[in-house]
Curated annotation (Swiss-Prot):
Subcellular location: Cell membrane
Species: Mycobacterium leprae (strain Br4923)
Keywords: Cell cycle, Cell division, Cell membrane, Membrane, Transmembrane, Transmembrane helix
Domain POTRA: 151-219
Sequence intervals crossing the membrane: 127-147
Any GO CC annotation of this UniProt entry: cell division site
Function recorded in the entry: Essential cell division protein.
Biological process, per Gene Ontology: cell septum assembly; FtsZ-dependent cytokinesis
Protein name, UniProt field: Cell division protein FtsQ
């Protein structure tokens, strides 16, 4: 205990604790920065060997008592304060070291211990493994079916033929018996069969375990035209698909250059397809020198002036009604004013 320049006594114990950042008697106060986190309270309490009282200016009684204490008592008190401060500092240092070692051991144990694998990762790996195995199995099965004769062609079924022969279809398809079904390109087979003149369309299908089915649609003659090599049959698209005697009651077509891209041919076919069935059976010839000048000749010699293909459905309906009336020439080129002569 000493005096300042103003004569006020100074508590050396309080001054020393202010320097080291620890409150007197190692008790600490809220907000003191000197106490290390994790300090063992038991160690600090054990380090206190004697209670120390802090002297302030607000305690005159204590001030008077300390002012008149003897030198021996003051020396003993100061030694006790130093011993208490030393013990508290040792306790704080030991607590700090213990906390540091505990944190180090915890970090080491966490680093050395293997981390458990998440359940989601395990499920994902299992799903991936199963997918890969199924893919490999499916690929192996497909490869086996592609090369093995276990599922090969043993029978070829052909449907839809009337005038086209089975041999023509098989020759065009080019499929050999014993060929694995998976090696057959069905689109290519259908295209090859459709190349036959009398075939309008074709379809090839695999029928497991050992059959190939080919379905065709033959062309149907709609009109016929005479050529030097004989009569040629044309279907509804204007395709010349056969040179053969025409079926009975098939009308002849008179155009310059019949074909699927000829405008006059297409116009004449539009008219024939618009006629009622009972009228079509009476048509012997259809002439189309141009798309706007179409004429029908009936089997009994009567003539029908049709005109262009405009309003073909209306003209066909009016013509069916007019043919019930006597006459030699029927004009439906203007369906609003049909006439009979």
């Amino acid at each position: 205990m000493t005096e300042t320049d103003e004569g006020a006594p100074v508590n050396h114990s309080a001054t020393m604790w202010a320097v080291v950042g620890v409150p007197p008697v190692c008790g600490g106060q809220p907000g003191d920065s000197g106490v290390v986190a994790g300090t063992s309270r038991a160690l600090v309490d054990a380090a206190i060997i004697a209670p120390v009282t802090t002297l302030t200016r607000d305690e005159p009684a204590q001030y008077d008592r300390y002012e008149f204490e003897g030198p021996r008592r003051r020396a003993r008190r100061e030694r006790a304060e130093r011993r208490a401060a030393q013990a508290c500092a040792i306790a704080i240092e030991e607590a700090r070291r213990e906390a540091k070692h505990r944190i180090h051991r915890q970090m080491s144990s966490e680093a050395n211990s293997p981390k458990p694998v998440a359940r989601g990762v395990v499920r994902g790996l299992k799903t991936l493994f199963a997918t890969v195995m199924f893919s490999i199995a499916g690929f192996g099965l497909g490869l086996a079916l592609y090369v093995t004769p276990a599922m090969s062609v043993r029978n070829i079924v052909v449907t839809g033929i009337e005038t086209v022969t089975r041999e023509e279809v098989l020759d065009a398809a080019g499929v050999q018996l014993g060929t694995p079904l998976l090696q057959i390109n069905t689109n290519q087979v259908a295209d090859q069969v459709a190349a036959i003149r009398r075939v309008a369309s074709a379809r090839a299908q695999r029928q497991y375990p050992s059959a190939l089915r080919i379905t065709i649609v033959e062309r149907v003659p709609v009109v016929v035209k005479d050529f030097p090599d004989g009569p040629h049959l044309f279907d509804c698209d204007g395709v010349d698909f056969a040179t053969a005697p025409p079926p009975p009651a098939l009308p002849y077509i008179d155009v310059g250059h019949p074909g699927p891209i000829d405008p006059a041919t297409k116009a004449a076919l539009v008219v024939l397809l618009a006629l009622r069935p009972e009228v079509v059976s009476q048509v012997a010839r259809i002439a189309a020198p141009s798309v706007s000048s179409i004429t029908l000749i009936l089997t009994d010699g009567r003539a029908v002036i049709w005109g262009s293909t405009d309003r073909a459905e209306e003209k066909a309906e009016k013509l069916a009604a007019l043919l019930t009336q006597p006459g030699r020439t029927y004009d439906v080129s203007s369906p609003d004013l049909p006439t009979v002569k």
